[in-house]
Amino acid sequence: RAVLVDMEPKAVRDVTAAAGATGRWSYAAGRTHCEQGGSGNNWAHGYYEHGPRCAQAVTELIRAELEAAERAGGVLIYQALAGGTGSGVGAHIAATVRDEWPELAVVSGAIWPSERGDVAVQPYN
């Protein structure tokens, strides 16, 4: 079970296409949330702007996955530490999940930035 979230549709489109091309894995249709503007590689922009704006839609996607499960013990959130969507929006969604489902374990897996990042502010997020 998965919900994919990004503020730029290209990343989600690429991931779902790559998974589908393998023939071994695919993501459920309708379990993605994308917007048209990125977070500008800025944690605060992701957390304070995009996070509150997309929290309800993402929460409903997560709720649908939890309700479809026979039993749910927790939510695993993978988020990139570089940039504004993974770090900022991811942190906001993690807090929202914790508030919405206090009985579930919430585990966050960090995806560390590359040593050769192409964005100057990457280490500061």
Model-assigned labels for residue ranges:
Residues R1-N125:
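Segments that form or flank anion-binding pockets
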